[in-house]
Amino acid sequence: MFERILPWSLQGIGPFLNTYGDVLFFRHIRRTPPIETNPRASTSVHSIVAHRFVYAYLVAVKSLLYHFSDITVFVHDDGSLNARDRELIRAHMPEAIIIDRAEITRRFDHDICDPFLSQVRSSYTSYLKLFDPTFLRHGQRIILLDTDTLFLRAPTAVINWARNGGEPWYHLAPRGNMKATSREKSATSQQEPHIQTLIMNDLVVLNDELGRDYRLEQGFCAGFVGYSVDLVDFKELRELLTCLYAKFGDRIFRWGAEQAIHGLLLCGKGAKALPIQDYFVYTQNNAGNVANATFVHFVGENRFFRFRYPRLAARLMRNLAGS
């Protein structure tokens, strides 16, 4: 009953924290000093940033820059950043490049001149991760970093890759339930399989039709990946998306499709998973492993489980403030 009356943000502690936790837990990032980055570096780090996660983003990216700052920082506005957000970002990373969503959309539509690709790109915000870093073609290597992430130690393997190049890579979510106790799936989820499941079930046929060798590793997560600027080819991407649209229709315009397509492209071109004991997606089942992690991705409804995310962020902010 109350779910029909109350807004989603007030329907429980999880929705409330996912809506307002940015200001509650991460605002003290404002007290940390700026970090100089390199706008001409061979590797760039790209994040899609929303107004309501701007503090969390600064904690995430500065937790990386604390260990390695010889990198170009691209902040992709999801369309909600305001003037104060932009000022805040520039105050903490003076050399960061902020990409205005409306402007890059105009550029993309004009330069690529492909209505179908433009439709896919604009259908869901996370698709900006798939299209825009490649469209910008800055330097030699691309890192994608979600805003709900933390580096707890120096990511040595990633730093070496950023300096010297190498094979593409990604991080993993563990297999099994994300929660310690599973609940019954909703009728909607039972009726409509996730797009990634549909693609996995049809992968052999998909490869035969396209003459490709796409693969998709179980647990692939696009929230922290690295690859060369020429790995994503828009001609190949159009062929893949056209085939997927013919099979699955508007499902390719919804949540999860961008990650699945990123997975096909990277895994199909030899990407390797970072060691899951060091780089992983946080769940209720692996919460005890955080103390030994290098990188943790705090996704969805598990983000504030046991409040480890804000506690670790608070420690990082203290370290940054003293640096």
Where are these regions (language model features)?
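Histidine-anchored nucleotide/phosphate-binding helix
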Residues: H51-F68
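Short internal beta-strands
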Residues: T72-S80, Y170-A173
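Short aromatic/hydrophobic "clamp" motif used to bind/position activated sugar donors
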Residues: I142
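Conserved donor-nucleotide/metal-binding helix-loop-beta segment in metal-dependent transferases, i.e.
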Residues: F151-T188
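Active-site-proximal specificity loops/subdomain of glycosyltransferases
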Residues: L88-L136
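Short, surface-exposed amphipathic charged segments that create phosphate/polyanion-binding patches used
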Residues: D109-R121, E184-T188, V290-T294
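The conserved acidic donor/metal-binding loop of glycosyltransferases
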Residues: D146-L150
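A glycosyltransferase accessory/donor-loop signature
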Residues: M1-S42, L198-S323
